[in-house]
Amino acid sequence: MKQGTVKWFNAEKGFGFIEVEGENDVFVHFSAINQEGYKSLEEGQSVEFEVVEGDRGPQAANVVKL
């Protein structure tokens, strides 16, 4: 699992990016967020996640808010 910080997340569109120190930003889709109900992330929030290979490159999976 990697740790990072939410760079930005557009709740209306359901996606954003997670910043990982010393690495490229990682795309995150709302469906990858592990929580019940409304799934969203806040800018600056710390998260833990796995990186998987998506259609357009690396993306976050199993995202957990810290």
Swiss-Prot record:
SUPFAM superfamilies: Nucleic acid-binding proteins (SSF50249)
InterPro entries: Cold_shock_CspA, Cold_shock_domain, CSD, CSD_CS, CSP_DNA-bd, NA-bd_OB-fold
Ranges for domain CSD: 1-66
The entry's keywords: Cytoplasm
Pfam families: CSD
Highest rank taxon of the organism: Bacteria
UniProt key word Lyase: no
GO CC list: cytoplasm
PROSITE patterns recorded: CSD_1, CSD_2
Function: Involved in cold stress response.
Protein known as: Cold shock protein CspA
Species this chain originates from: Staphylococcus saprophyticus subsp. saprophyticus (strain ATCC 15305 / DSM 20229 / NCIMB 8711 / NCTC 7292 / S-41)
